[in-house]
Amino acid sequence: MLSESLTKTKLTDPLILDLLQNIRKHRSMLEDLKSIKIDPNLTNIISNEIGRELYIENEFHKAKGFRKLHIEVAEFSKNLRILHCVFFPDPKFDIPIFGMDLVKINDIVSAAIVDLSPASQNQALKYEKLLSGVDKSSFTSLREIPKWGRIFSNNVFFASLRNKSEKNDFCSVVDQYLSILIKLSKKAKPEFNEEIIQERIDFQKNYCAQQMKNEKTSMVLLKYFDEKWVNNYIKTVLFDF
């Protein structure tokens, strides 16, 4: 769990709190849920330096069918807030990668993205109809997927959120994508064919490699940390494989 100082005192953003609650609710539905120990220097990072205030707090878990369930909450200089979440499947199981990011500058949500990204060849065909059935018609400011975003499914949702109604609707989309993920994970059976497992490993490695091409992640962190620390954080905490 995130510390009380974050969830009850510092973190007052209602949208992020709603999304956090929803993600945790679905995470709790997974079998054999256990916390993962990570270097504490990378788990909770807080600075009160005037003009450079920041906190980053992470949650790491694993469960049946998932090698890593990661949630990150961050605030930079009191105006930039980020919620980042990736659920990486265990390659023995045919489960997609759940990813969600929200970027909020003051009261403006400049980026909101959620997807169930394929973690094996043709995997998306198994859930494409389910994702396409999620209503996304209310959003007015859809954003273009970057070139490195070929890792996403055809039903990746990426937009700026313009008002309270769109923020509520985004929470609903996330909820439905998570519900689909949980259903898929419940049906998944362990695979023992080494070639199939290796294919899934390669898909996750590529997912991480493509995500690391998103320069915006490092640009934010480099304002507060040196390049060595940033590279280690991205490769160890965010996109390890």
UniProtKB/Swiss-Prot annotation:
The keyword Transferase does not apply. It is an enzyme of class 1 (oxidoreductase). Gene3D superfamilies: 3.40.1500.20. Its EC number is 1.3.7.5. Keywords: Oxidoreductase. One of its GO terms (molecular function) is phycocyanobilin:ferredoxin oxidoreductase activity. It holds the Pfam family Fe_bilin_red. InterPro entries: Ferredoxin-dep_bilin_Rdtase (IPR009249), Ferredoxin_bilin_OxRdtase (IPR022870). One of its GO terms (biological process) is phytochromobilin biosynthetic process. It catalyses: (2R,3Z)-phycocyanobilin + 4 oxidized [2Fe-2S]-[ferredoxin] = biliverdin IXalpha + 4 reduced [2Fe-2S]-[ferredoxin] + 4 H(+). Catalyzes the four-electron reduction of biliverdin IX-alpha (2-electron reduction at both the A and D rings); the reaction proceeds via an isolatable 2-electron intermediate, 181,182-dihydrobiliverdin. Belongs to the HY2 family. This is Phycocyanobilin:ferredoxin oxidoreductase.
